[in-house]
Amino acid sequence: MDLRRAERNLKILGDANSDEDMPVAHSVEETQGQALFSESDEADAEEDAAESPQSGVGGRTTTAESGGEEHREQVFLSTQVQGRIDEFEATEGARRQFRQLVTGFTYAQEDGEANAGGRTAKRVPKVRRTRRNNTKVRSLTEFNTENFERLRKEDRARSLLTMLSGKTQKVNNLLRGLQQERSRERAFHGCSVYNEGEWREIVRLLHERLPKATRSDVACIKSYVYGDGLDETPWCASHARPPDCPAQSQERQGTCGPGDDELRIFTLSQLLEDQSASEDVIPDSMDAGDAVSLGSPQPQAGLSQHSFCPDSTATSPLRPPATPLTRAPASPLPVRVYTAPASPLDYIPDSEDDPYVLQGPSQARSPPSLLEVRRTLKNIGVRPGRSAAAVRKAAAAVARIEAASDAASLGTASDADRRSALFLRMTALVRRSPRLLAHIYCLRPVALDDLRAVLEADDDFIALLDDSLIRQWADFTGICVKNDTSDSQRPPQPLESQ
């Protein structure tokens, strides 16, 4: 739009300059620029340019050729075009200044002066190679192997000092300080050492716990326990056989002679059959091979002669001991016994010969209230009616079922007994229906409504039972009960007509 206005203005100015006979009009055109560039003139110029673009171009060319250098200095531009050009230049100048400001912007220094220089690349610290630490533990197994003795001594010293002094912190600080001095590290200033009194107490306890014994005392004790002619160590000598033991008992293995001085091994069946001790074959103990015999016990060896001492106090399962083992009689102590005189009415003869069971006297008891009966019926799974007559009728039916099942009465029986009586009643009703029984034996599911209908047909009392009680009875007896009566496994006819 600005280019068109500029072209139109140039055209008008060229026409005005080419007309030399009208100086007044030329001055008017120069002084009244706003009137010449009105909206009506602009619209007319646009229409003329649209109708004859070729003529306009030819006119501009003719005007440019006819005008001279003397008229070019007097070219007048529209104030609107000049204003737009000024705004564009101001915008470009502001953008240029802003770009320079952003380019030269930096953070202020500590002294408050801004750094006018450009951005500098961030310096990356140079990676320095660390020295290899030769004291670093590379293998835990190697460390434990090399320092096993030292660690064991330190642990023993720590445990011993802790047990004697009872001060764990002091012991740990002391050992830590010694370890740091050994490794030539900096001096340890945080340990708390023992004073003179504490060291004296530790030494006294050491003498009490570890009494000093001379070598002669140790040799005397060794000769008394193991004998004078002990050539081997006590551990090896304790496993050696007695020197006077016959060698033939060691050589023969599995042979059993008829001697009376040898012990025999018997099985339980031989003992029950009362067989003699001279039997050579023991068929129940082994399938093949010779019988196993035990040598006769040797006389007791003294402690000063032998290292093996058989125990003659062991009891044998075959023969009773010669001297029965009894406890020493305890000293008699006076004991006061209180006896209460029993009345002849409280005396009950205790005899196993009585063919009947003794029963105590029955005590009179008040009948249960209506609320208790209702609560009892709800606990066992019976739905009592709202009226008192319905509750009494249901209670009488339950009592009748309990009497038929040899259970206790409603007032004295427990809820489990009453529930068991109801289970027995429903089981008896199922056994009366051969069709239902065959249906159950075939492991076919039975609808709950059909099962209720069959049971209620034989006994009206089943209508008072809850569904939960019937399901519990079905789970107890192994009957598969289903809710959906439209199942495909449901028989096409009712159970009574099958």
Curated annotation (Swiss-Prot):
Residues 1-75, 239-260, 281-330 are annotated as: Disordered. Regulatory subunit of the SLX1-SLX4 structure-specific endonuclease that resolves DNA secondary structures generated during DNA repair and recombination. Has endonuclease activity towards branched DNA substrates, introducing single-strand cuts in duplex DNA close to junctions with ss-DNA. GO terms for cellular component: Slx1-Slx4 complex. Belongs to the SLX4 family. It comes from the Eukaryota. Signal peptide: none annotated. This is Structure-specific endonuclease subunit SLX4. It holds the Pfam family Slx4. Phosphorylated in response to DNA damage. One of its GO terms (biological process) is DNA recombination. Forms a heterodimer with SLX1. Residues 1-10 have a biased composition (Basic and acidic residues). It comes from Eremothecium gossypii (strain ATCC 10895 / CBS 109.51 / FGSC 9923 / NRRL Y-1056) (Yeast). Keywords: DNA damage, DNA recombination, DNA repair, Nucleus, Phosphoprotein. It is found in: Nucleus. InterPro entries: Structure-sp_endonuc_su_Slx4. Residues 295-307 have a biased composition (Polar residues). Residues 39-50 have a biased composition (Acidic residues).
